[in-house]
Regions:
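Charge-rich, low-hydrophobicity low-complexity segments
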Residues: 1-46, 88-345
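Basic (Lys/Arg-enriched) interaction patch that binds polyanionic ligands
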Residues: 38-75, 81, 269
Length: 345
């Protein structure tokens, strides 16, 4: 007997049943014996990730240990309870793919709602004239005429799914996209028996689109205790719970929170889409530290630091601020017009 799962994951026995767990727990270190890891699930590593290893997961990744000279990539959020040294961390790759799909989809759901109403009118008008116009033929005429853009968008959606792999998207979204693409391409013309059938496809596609947009409302974060000489990218926040970030390159779409008691951000380059709070920014000796706060977030304390050392260069709303002397209690922000609000500089 052969069993096929509807989702990817680890099969486990539960009495007379077989359950596929989309959350996999690995007890031990990821090292030479395990090799690299690539799973389409959430992965929890109850250990460390050793030098040279690559770990890629489609959903969330948790490492209950340290990461040394490794590459970690999560479609969702990424958490490391220990320190990360000379490593690359990526979180939110799945969200980037979802954005790509939604961009290809464009306004297709709204356009299709208009198409369904137009098909209904065309069929009704033909009936009033004593003629019979199948809904599928009316739809085909619209797809080859004024609504050819709908067909183009759905072809782009299919191309995105093919390029990234169907496993990167919810199964329902892929099924809805395939069903609509099949119909608007004219391949399902004879299968379309009524306008209600078309509207049902459109509603399903719109529901899946809404679900995908909901995913983007919760950007993926990176959370760890300590970063040294790392390259970090996250669509959401970066949260540091330990001593800080040193000589690293940071790109986060959300906030940067360095929460340790006397946490430090020193050396390297940080690009932040939201707010940034840190105890100590820069270090002794005046070594250069670059911080870019991108976008036009309106807040008087978008950058807050207890101590800022000389050599720190901050760009906020395209305004450059260079710290040449030691400053304490620094808060920088912007007003509604995007103008700089230095409270202490």
């Amino acid at each position: 007997m052969h069993l096929y799962a509807a989702v990817d994951g680890r099969p486990t026995h539960a009495g007379a049943m077989v359950i596929v767990e989309e959350r996999i727990t690995f007890h031990g270190d990821i090292g030479v014996e395990t090799g690299d890891v690539d799973v389409n699930a959430t992965l929890v590593v109850m250990g460390s990730v050793d030098e040279g290893r690559e770990v890629r997961v489609a959903h969330d990744l948790e490492v209950h240990g340290d990461v040394d000279r490794a590459h970690l990539e999560a479609g969702g959020s990424l958490t490391v309870t220990g320190s990360c040294v000379h490593s690359q961390l990526r979180a939110g790759g799945r969200q980037a793919v979802v954005r790509h799909l939604l961009a290809a989809l464009g306004s297709t759901s709204e356009d299709l709602a208009v198409v369904a109403t137009t098909v209904e009118h065309m069929v009704s008008s033909a009936r009033d004239r004593g003629q019979q116009l199948p809904p599928g033929r009316a739809l085909l005429a619209l797809m080859e005429g004024p609504y050819a853009g709908v067909r183009t968008h759905m072809a782009e959606v299919e191309a995105v799914i093919d390029a990234h792999g169907a496993a990167m998207f919810p199964e329902g979204a892929v099924a809805a996209a395939h069903a609509v693409s099949h119909v608007v391409a004219g391949l399902g013309m004879h299968e379309l028996t009524g306008v209600d059938q078309l509207r049902a496809l459109i509603v399903t596609l719109a529901d899946q689109e809404h679900a995908l947009r909901t995913q983007l409302a919760d950007p993926s974060a990176v959370r760890t205790a300590y970063l040294q000489a790392c390259d970090v990218e996250a669509s959401g926040d970066l949260v540091i719970t330990g001593s800080g970030i040193f000589n690293s390159t940071i790109f986060v779409g959300g906030d940067l929170w360095v929460e340790g008691g006397r946490s430090t951000l020193r050396g390297g380059h940080a690009i932040v889409g939201g707010a940034m709070h840190v105890h100590e920014l820069g270090g002794d000796g005046g070594a250069r530290m670059d911080v870019e706060l991108q976008g036009r977030t309106v807040t008087p304390d978008r950058l807050r630091a207890d101590v800022v050392h000389p050599g720190v260069h901050v760009t906020i709303n395209e305004y450059p601020v260079v710290f040449e002397d030691l400053r304490q209690g620094v808060a920088l922000g912007a007003d509604e017009e995007g103008h700089l609000l230095p409270q202490a500089a």
